[in-house]
Amino acid sequence: MAYSIANNPLLRKNFAKIKKIIEIPNLIDIQKNSYKRFLQLDVPAEARKYSGLEAVFKSVFPIKDFSETASLEYVSYSLGIPKYDVEECHQRGMTFAAPMKVKVRLVVWDVNKEPSTRSIRDIKEQEVYFGEIPLMTENGTFIINGTERVIVSQLHRSPGVFYDHDKGKTHSSGKVLYSARVIPYRGSWLDFEFDHKDILYVRIDRRRKMPATVLLKALGYSTDKLLNFFYKSEEIFFEGDKLMKIADPELLTNQKAVVDIVDPNTGEVLVKANRKFTKAAIRKMAEHGIKYIPITIEEVLGKVASHDIVDPATGEVLAECNEELTQVKIDEIKGRGIATFKVLFIDNLHVTSSLRDTILIDKIGSTDDALIEIYRRLRPGDPPTLKSALALFENLFFNPERYDLSAVGRLKLNYKLGLQIPLDCMTLTREDVLEVVRYLIDLKNGKGSIDDIDHLGNRRVRAVGELLENQYRIGLVRMERAIKERMSLQEVENLMPHDLINSKPVSAVVKEFFGSSQLSQFMDQTNPLSEVTHKRRLSALGPGGLTRERAGFEVRDVHPTHYGRVCPIETPEGPNIGLIASLSTYARINEHGFVETPYRLVKEGKVTTEVRFFSALEEEGHAIAQANAEVDSDGRFVADYISARKSGEFVLVGRDELELMDVAPMQLVSVAASLIPFLENDDANRALMGSNMQRQAVPLLRADSPLVGTGMERVVARDSGVSVVARHNGVVESVDASRIVVKIDEDEYDETGTGVDIYNLIKFARSNQNTCINQRPVVKIGDHVKRSDVIADGPSTDMGELALGQNVLVAFMPWGGYNFEDSILISERLVKDDRYTSIHIEEFECVARDTKLGKEEITADIPNLGEETLKDLDESGIIRIGAEVRPGDILIGKITPKGETQLSPEEKLLRAIFGEKAGDVRDTSLRVPPGVEGTVIGAKIFSRKGADKDARTELIEKAEEQKLRKDEQDEIRIIRESAVGKLKKLLVGKTAAVKFEGKDGKVLIVKGKAITEEALLSVPVDRWDEISIADDDTVDEKVAQILGTLNQQIDIIKYVFDDKIQKLKRGDDLPPGVIKMVKVYIAIKRKLQVGDKMAGRHGNKGVVSRILPEEDMPYLEDGRPVEIVLNPLGVPSRMNVGQILETHLGWAAKGIGWQIEDMLEKNSPQNQIKTYLKEVYGNKEMNKFLDSLEEEELNNVAKRLKRGVPMASPVFEGASEQGIQEMLGKAGFEYTGQVTLYDGKSGVAFKHKVTVGIMYVLKLHHLVDDKIHARSIGPYSLVTQQPLGGKAQFGGQRLGEMEVWAMEAYGAAYALQEFLTVKSDDVAGRTRMYEAIVKGKHTLEPGLPESFNVLIKELQSLGLDVELLENEEE
């Protein structure tokens, strides 16, 4: 069976040496999965997880009134069917959204006063309309008001706790000050920081700081609890006159012995005085059974009591907790006969006194005072009461409605502080706060590490779903307030849920988010790559993110954790550099929002095929080998030591210590960068430009996939959604330019399935960037297609591969100065062959409104215009399709009523001759703007419901209806044929149980005889279920089932199409005051011309400087002229050598193509062609494929390859120098890749050999036609009366200060006077000039420029009385 060449990836020779381990995940899954998790559409209401919309509803509901006598509870939500489909939304300027209904329950309670209990009085449940919610299209975009938009994912700081220091910059002493910050997902921030005196302070929400112990006391901790939590204590006792302390090994480490420590039994000195207690010494003491050691009084002086020291006899407090012990105190303790007491262990080396010092400066004693102090700091001016202070403090950190750490925040907090708090505890706990402070104090004491906020374990991605979830919550909270008010104002028992709920605030928030949020962007639809990249973009900007001005270098920089997650290359140039990034090819986002990348697991020095995804935190500490580390056939590493990544550094690691290995070399770059062959030979700055410029390539009329690609082209084209992909396996039944019909294979659907797929192709639609979207079939009738095969190419795709530019023959040499400084010299051949011609589609819209003076009308009857002007308008006043239009031509005729004004004599005369009509309307027709010249390719008319339709509308509707009816008939025909085929298999050859008569009584099927196909077809299909089969009851059942299904399907199809036609004929929803809206589409063909910008894929860009006749171009020995001449000096300083390697490999690919063409022309035997192809490909799978081909199929393949054999040189594992030379050899070229060129003008050979080859060159969106602009007369600024600036405003050219100096330097006084007066802002002079020119006089009288009047007014506004005195000469 014929398979289409389009879907054979083997035809591209691949240089990759590493076998593909896993497929690249779908490129737009980041968008689709996020929104899927948000809506949970395919999950039944009761099984929905607590995430997305469900989570928002459950967190805001139930809503109770203030007295808690009623509550509104959430049950479930459901989405309806969108009113318009995607296509209709595009055309009508609507939003593709589904209506949402929420089922809520209103419960009313009776409150019994006596034993304060509640009993349910009433429960009402109801579905309430809750506004519309935009749906995502198949391709991961949203259609808002008729335009496609993308919600860019945001990269923001993850919630959790972060430790940092100021690098010694805050205080003049250069002391390093540590700080901690607890950031929740929503709620108040909590900051702890040390000052230069080592006092610990706390800030809530970045307000004024206060001692940290105020907060800790507010949590209910007393001074002694705090001291004993943060400090260890030592026990000291008296033994006669001596002081002793208990030898606690943990505390003794690193202390010094004050006196000799002697074994009392043997007298052996275990530790000498002034020596440190080492681990060995402590062990020795334990062996000798020493439990306590002598200390001197000096050592105890200045120590701090860890508890109150109380005289047991009298109960008198001798020393308070946190009091320093003096000689007097110690004597008193001893005198009172207290045997032991405890002091805090503070040595100011390993344990500092910062927390104790903080307690000392903190004058607040009780919890209540602490709460009131916090209230005063947060609400200055409010009179504090204990109740309000407690409520405020509880709400700050412990109320789930006000404070939410989120699962991620809790995870990070537990991870950093080593806590075991369950993940569903989303608020702070007292334990959290203590541990945060403890870690901060440890950090100051030299334990623990600070966090790197640019580490991808500390930054997470908020994709569409989560961003919308946050907006939805805001809307619901606004709605909640309104509901509470309504509940308290009205009698609840008389109300239904819908009386309480007004979904306007929610709809408004959603609408605002999609319409005007910084992250909701107009989709970049220039070409398929730009679409995919836009959907995979990560932005650090946006609400809750960074701002360009405040972002420093660190945030923008590449970080080791970006490896395999975020592309180090692709980012914009300019102020956003580093703030906007792109997801790497294999990366995905996990449920916590962290970016993960896949690795192969390594076990005992052997690589397995098992692949696991790791986030940046999970991979920490693992040794990870590169994808190109050499392994043998068993997967064992060849070398003993392997270069690997570990904790952000490259280290040499023994093979047995390796734990992970990259899955592919291109894992670390993004989609756009992975499309650049020989990326490894380009400088990073140029690679950045290359990946950005590929996104600006305009789709060309004739797409041409690159001869030298990377193998990613097919993936991008498939996932971008611009090409049409088969939904099932099947055979192509019919193909034309606008649709493909595929009959599905039998094993693909069950017996009752339909068995037909109809694909309607998009023809010449306009993209967001005015480029042309057009789909072309690549399959023939009878081709067999497999699921997910490409059956039609979209814009910039060729045979299912991305094709952004053209393969052209380039030579690197200077040529007459025309390629100086990145200019490009091109051959006229490229223009003649339409190689770089692109189609651009402009949309023009004209609206007829109902004005105060009467209705506007769209008509061909326009006053004061000749026949010639109106020749292309039809009777409805709309231009005909196919008309060639130029600037100034009328597209849509429209007249607007005008108020009665004083008539001029001419108008009076016209009125007298033609009656009323000509006078009371003015011509407001839509005309073609300057710079647009093209062909009208379509018109759409939208008219108000109930308005009369004009002839053109009826014509358009009729054509649409015919198209729909044809689809309907085809679908029914194929389903019917398929069903008949199945029924024939069942019935033909079976024995009839009864005879079957036609309507005329003629016997069509004889009883007891086998049914023939002829006899069967003489019976109408609808009555086949009446045929009864002998000996087999199942056949009758199956026949009835198939016919039943057939009729059911036909009914469904008819219903669907009738509905579409009904919609077509219905009037349109137009904005208020609009009677009719007409859109006209003009296709503009842009050929390549001087001034257009072109670029390669390696950041090598330039502007076309001259188009040379092909006979003047330098030519090869066989007479072929080159097509583009580039300057060789553009390569060395820019260090993008990849373009040269691409040129060489392209030359080889082309040469091999010429060899194949030569064989075909000479009618070489099949075997010879096969052998040559096998030699070129050198690949077992390809050999197998070639051997399986029949003669005709082989010829088709060879014909396809004679343009050149496509090569894939994947990123970081591309063709080596040796590989390129080998290919050049097979093509019959010299291995240098250089040839002798001849001058096209003289025919003389150039002195040196020149590098010639095939380079893939793109035409970028910066077209000179869009930029060139000229003006004679036009609009003026209101205040200054000077011409406006810019093409969009049809402005003039600015003659600035420097230009005036130049004119002065040349002494061109009169020209300059004209420039500054009559040609600019001298209003009276302009008019005089016009009159003079009309009357044929050429005198110039400049007057006073308007800007002078502006200057005078400005001076007057400063209070200076300036007036202009005119000197009247007698």
Curated annotation (Swiss-Prot):
GO cellular component, one term: DNA-directed RNA polymerase complex
Enzyme type, top EC level: transferase
Keywords: DNA-directed RNA polymerase, Nucleotidyltransferase, Transcription, Transferase
Catalyzed reaction equations: RNA(n) + a ribonucleoside 5'-triphosphate = RNA(n+1) + diphosphate
InterPro entries assigned to the protein according to its UniProt record, in alphabetical order: DNA-dir_RNA_pol_bsu_ext_1_sf (IPR042107), DNA-dir_RNA_pol_bsu_external_1 (IPR019462), DNA-dir_RNA_pol_su2 (IPR015712), DNA-dir_RNAP_su2_dom (IPR007120), DNA-dir_RNAP_su2_hyb_sf (IPR037033), RNA_pol_bsu_bac (IPR010243), RNA_pol_bsu_CS (IPR007121), RNA_pol_bsu_protrusion (IPR007644)
GO molecular function: DNA binding; DNA-directed RNA polymerase activity; ribonucleoside binding
Domain of life: Bacteria
Keyword Protein biosynthesis recorded: no
EC code(s) of this entry: 2.7.7.6
Single Gene Ontology BP annotation: DNA-templated transcription
Coiled-coil stretches noted in the UniProt entry, renumbered to this chain: none
NCBIfam families: PRK00405.1, rpoB
PANTHER family, alphabetized: DNA-DIRECTED RNA POLYMERASE I SUBUNIT 2
Functional description taken from the UniProt entry: DNA-dependent RNA polymerase catalyzes the transcription of DNA into RNA using the four ribonucleoside triphosphates as substrates.
Record note on quaternary structure: The RNAP catalytic core consists of 2 alpha, 1 beta, 1 beta' and 1 omega subunit. When a sigma factor is associated with the core the holoenzyme is formed, which can initiate transcription.
Annotated family: Belongs to the RNA polymerase beta chain family.
Protein's recorded name: DNA-directed RNA polymerase subunit beta
Organism: Geotalea uraniireducens (strain Rf4)
